[in-house]
């Protein structure tokens, strides 16, 4: 059983061991597979209901190749059920090692939690981002991560726009995962061959305007190069 951390792991912390069902092959995805062999970029995402996450995963194929040139493997973990992931990625294959974690326990073992939505009547002085927020606060902080939108939009409008653009149809599994973990943060952790975190990025640390964001390709490759020196 993985231990749950209240705060995101930092460089120097030991990464949690995980073993999860693999999406694009039989077997499992495990951090131990890389122990004493090579570093790993572990990317933790929300479920397929999240259009930003779907796009980040699609872009990982390019990043994966560049990280591979630095001797770093790439593993993405999606907060959904195995059969749903296999159904989706069968028609949208990606050249990235994928695992599923429907309870998001791996995310929380890395200290990446979800925020609690409070009533809109909550005194703003009582809100403590990234632990708590209100729907009003989220709607008042428009986003456009990585320029995927024609202009900045609130999260609900952005999600609807991208889902429609992608032709994405929500399933019962997607709806259930969204209900349970819709406010889960995403993250990327570079773990060296010894199992130690060397670099990390966690979504929206500075405020809700960062929702939907992810570490950029250049940032991840630079981190990989840094541990190779």
Residue ranges of predicted features:
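N-terminal "domain-start" segment that seeds a small globular fold
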Residues: 1-32
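A generic fold-level signal
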Residues: 10-13, 36, 69, 183
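Short loop/turn microsegments at loop-to-beta-strand junctions
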Residues: 16, 41, 185-187
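Short active-site neighborhood of thiol/selenol oxidoreductases, capturing the structured segment around
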Residues: 30-61, 73-74
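Catalytic metal- and UDP-sugar-binding loop of GT-A-like glycosyltransferases, i.e.
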Residues: 44, 77, 191
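Structural microenvironment flanking redox-active thiols in thiol-disulfide oxidoreductases
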Residues: 56-109
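Thiol/selenol-based redox catalytic cores and closely related redox-interacting motifs
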Residues: 101-209
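A short, polar/charged loop-to-alpha-helix boundary motif
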Residues: 204-228
């Amino acid at each position: 059983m993985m231990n749950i951390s209240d705060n995101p792991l930092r460089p120097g912390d030991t990464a949690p061991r995980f073993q999860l069902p693999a999406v694009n092959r039989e077997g499992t995805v495990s951090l131990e597979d890389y122990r004493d062999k090579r570093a790993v970029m572990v990317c933790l995402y929300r479920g397929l209901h999240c259009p930003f996450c779907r796009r980040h995963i699609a872009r990982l194929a390019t990043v994966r190749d560049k990280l591979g040139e630095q001797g770093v493997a790439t593993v993405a973990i999606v907060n959904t059920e195995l059969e749903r992931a296999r159904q989706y990625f069968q028609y949208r294959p990606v050249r990235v090692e994928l695992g599923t974690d429907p309870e998001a326990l791996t995310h929380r073992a890395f200290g990446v939690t979800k925020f609690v939505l409070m009533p809109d009547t909550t005194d703003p002085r009582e809100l403590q981002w990234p632990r708590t927020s209100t729907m009003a606060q989220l709607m008042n902080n428009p986003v456009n991560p990585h320029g995927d939108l024609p202009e900045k939009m609130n999260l609900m409008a952005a999600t609807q726009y991208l889902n429609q653009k992608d032709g994405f149809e929500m399933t019962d599994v997607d709806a259930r995962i969204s209900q349970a973990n819709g406010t889960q943060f995403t993250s990327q952790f570079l773990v060296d061959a010894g199992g130690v975190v060397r670099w990390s990025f966690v979504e929206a640390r500075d405020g809700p305007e960062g929702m939907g964001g992810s570490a950029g390709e250049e940032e991840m490759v630079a981190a990989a190069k840094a541990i190779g020196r």
